[in-house]
């Protein structure tokens, strides 16, 4: 019964988390929760803040750095660094690379304006044990868009079966 409910709710628009509109579904949050039960990253990097509800969810699981190219109004949290910038700005790229290098384990989430480019650019900086997820799987990003990077960086699928089971638009990999 839960499985049927999760499938039904998986792609529901206008989902909320803690009363705020969120672009992810409840099945996505379930997958993130499973990830954070298994891994305890000391930094969560989120590309694409949107309205900040997922940022709030992430903040319950650790220190977050969220980057968006638009300045929007949303709630602020003490363990979140908010940055308004282009994620492909060479200075921003260098800063992200440095942060990844200097943290024990990083959870990296691609959900800004160009998920293909985000994944293909930033996956190269991940260390062994780091995790990368993308949103809008099969809509805005497909396997053929990132297969070369997956192979080159020796990324292994993470919770893909669960994502498929619950019709989630997430896909994750671990290095």
Where are these regions (language model features)?
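A short alpha-helical cap/connector motif
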Residues: 1-108, 112-175
